[in-house]
Design a protein with these regions (language model features):
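N-terminal nucleic-acid engagement/recognition segments and initiation subdomains in replication
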Residues: 1-154, 166-173
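Conserved AAA+/SF3 P-loop NTPase catalytic/coupling segment centered on the Walker-B
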Residues: 243-267, 300-305
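A short helix-turn-beta junction within AAA+ P-loop NTPase domains corresponding to the substrate/partner-engaging
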Residues: 300-319
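C-terminal, non-catalytic macromolecule-binding modules
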Residues: 314-335
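AAA+/SF3 P-loop NTPase mechanochemical coupling elements
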Residues: 235-241, 275-293
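Conserved catalytic/switch belt of AAA+ P-loop NTPases
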Residues: 259-282
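Structural recognition of the conserved hydrophobic beta-strand(s) that form the central parallel beta-sheet
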Residues: 246-249, 274, 287-295, 311-312
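P-loop NTPase catalytic core of nucleic-acid-dependent motor ATPases
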Residues: 129-241
Length: 335
């Protein structure tokens, strides 16, 4: 009261700050604020009310100006999360990383030390507003590639590192179609890759490693390995709108109901769910393509049909660590 803080703001703060207090916090503050002659008699050191009459709290403009001095910010459309890049001490631009609670708390602490009364929720709200520029990691990567020369079959060379027991040319043809469809689904909301690409072979034959290395380092974060195949969760639905490839290990462990769910997932064009702590459902495009590994040739048991699966039994795979992928060539051709 004496420092000029509005009763409603002070009461709201106290209720949250002393949530475990059994007494009537609001009644205590009503009693204190009855002494109207004391209101605003003491200056708040280093802090003065804003002209906008917002009870002395930092305005949106104040917070945005402060954030401009701290780092670069962007909103990742694939992950639905804010990212930040902090400049190094030498002035070099830093790499973008996802914002976490510790970083937001640090921003609040730094701004408070500058003499600003700021709500941490206001900082979060601004970071999740139009203040942060939109960033699409897939557009950023693919538009930066050099055009394909129209001749060199980079995808064919990549497919040739997998040696299958069936006709090699058939495998290479289907892999090329699956890979091109996976890239198309990143950019066209009406395109969904309906087929599930599966490598069958013994353990230790580089199946998962080869699939994992399909994505370039810049997009490696968008490869997801699903090892718990016993159930399909809400998080699995969100993964359809976030990742490029979802790899299901040991898919022979899938039960009949899970197989049916996965078949339905492959044709689902959008994900319409509410994320944890979000206020509204999000209507997000299905961008992921599914792949998998198994050592069981007889993993398909659906008598109604298996046209969504592209299974190939391998005899061997060239060591992915000694046979690196020509990412620029492969993806300029696929794009």
């Amino acid at each position: 009261n004496a420092y000029g803080v509005a009763q409603a703001s002070a009461t709201q703060w106290a209720v949250k700050r002393f949530a475990d207090y059994d007494g009537d916090v609001a009644a205590i503050f009503r009693s204190c604020y009855q002494h109207t002659e004391e209101h605003g008699r003491r200056p708040l050191q280093g802090r003065t009310p804003n002209a906008g009459g917002n009870d002395g709290f930092a305005s949106v403009e104040d917070i945005e100006r402060f954030l401009d001095t701290q780092a670069r910010f962007r909103y990742n459309e694939a992950t639905g999360k804010c990212e930040t890049a902090v400049a190094g001490t030498d002035g070099a631009k830093g790499e973008y990383t996802e914002i976490d609670d510790r970083f937001v708390n640090t921003l609040w602490s730094r701004m408070s030390k500058q003499g600003k009364t700021v709500r941490i929720n206001d900082i979060r709200a601004i970071l999740h507003s139009e203040y942060t520029v939109l960033f699409n990691p897939f557009t950023d990567y693919f538009e930066g590639l050099k055009p394909w020369d129209g001749v060199t079959d980079h995808i064919g060379r990549l497919a040739a590192t997998v040696h299958v027991k069936s006709e090699q040319s058939v495998f290479e043809g289907y892999f090329k179609k699956w890979l091109v469809a996976s890239i198309a689904s990143l950019f066209d909301r009406e395109t969904v890759n309906h087929e599930i690409f599966v490598l069958i072979g013994p353990q230790g034959s580089y199946k998962t490693t080869w699939l994992n290395k399909l994505l370039p380092p810049a997009l490696q974060r968008y490869f997801y390995i699903k090892s718990n195949n016993n159930r399909i969760t809400k998080d699995d639905m969100f993964s359809l709108a976030e990742f490029v490839f979802i790899c299901m290990e040991e898919i022979d462990e899938l039960g009949a109901s899970e197989l049916n769910q996965i078949k339905a997932m492959t044709t689902q064009k959008v994900v319409n769910e509410r994320m944890a702590y979000a206020h509204y459902k999000e209507h997000r495009a299905h961008i992921a393509s599914l792949c998998g590994t198994t050592n069981n040739v007889q993993f398909l048991t659906d008598l109604t049909g298996n046209r969504r699966w592209l299974p190939f039994e391998i005899s061997s795979i060239d060591n992915p660590y000694t046979h690196p992928v020509d990412y620029e060539g492969v993806y300029s051709q696929a794009y």
